Amino acid sequence: MGNFILHPIQSRLIVISYSILILILPLYALFSYASNASWSLILEKATDPIAVAAYTLTIKMALYTAIINTIFGFIIAWVLTRYNFSGKRIMDAIVDLPLALPTSVAGLALSTVFGRNGLFGHILDFYNYEIIYTKRGILLAMIFVSFPFSVRAIQPILKEINKEEEEAAWSLGSGPLETFKRFIFPIILPAILNGFTLTFSRSLSEFGSIVMVAGNLPLQDLVSSVLISQYLEQYDYIGACVISIIVLMLACSVLLFVQIIHSLVVVDSK
């Protein structure tokens, strides 16, 4: 069987066509449908107090999640890369578990553990501390579903670090902290930013687990994805499209900001 080689023009055509079909066309349809409404209606839907509260809560929880998972993701990646211990392979496999679980199953699992009658819920209830059906439940759900991204972004870079160069830094009198600060951290910083971006994006789009662990009450713990679902259930397609576009624009703004920082970091490291 001969080698299957595509002409460069054919390759570009396939890539462009696939991108248009999967990415551009759905977004165009979203903007096109929203454009059928009057500007006054779009403004009314976009600035509705319930919608504004949902944007704010969603962005805030996604940022908190990205910060938390980036910190702990680095720690876990460091342990999995630098240490050998029994059960290491099992722990490494467990990291990817949230990617395999349906989000509704994740929500049910979290409710079973942290609900009022759950494994830890009754202990938390004794201290009048609730997680499920509160904003804490949203944060917990986002942390769970986006947990693997920072670990998997940082782990390969840590594996590629030249141990001989690291040992050379130690031999020159640099302590472990100084070696990490001057040698290791600049190398892994782009990966940390990538992990942060992936975690933030995944958290922003979460729906299945949040709808099960949050109270989904307007102006309290209602996130944008659930609000969009509620609009669709009410056959308010214009409202759903407007909210979707606003969330998309907010997400793109944050991601653009992170990418600018990433570019500056890469330039400085060269």
Swiss-Prot record:
Q: Which residues form the ABC transmembrane type-1 domain?
A: 55-256
The terms under GO molecular function for this entry are:
ABC-type sulfate transporter activity
Can the keyword Ribosomal protein be found in this entry's annotation? no
Q: What does this protein do?
A: Part of the ABC transporter complex cysAWTP (TC 3.A.1.6.1) involved in sulfate/thiosulfate import. Probably responsible for the translocation of the substrate across the membrane.
Primary residence? plastid
Name the UniProt record assigns to this protein: Probable sulfate transport system permease protein cysT
Q: Organism source for this protein?
A: Helicosporidium sp. subsp. Simulium jonesii (Green alga)
Disulfides per UniProt: none
The taxonomy runs: Eukaryota, Viridiplantae, Chlorophyta, core chlorophytes, Trebouxiophyceae
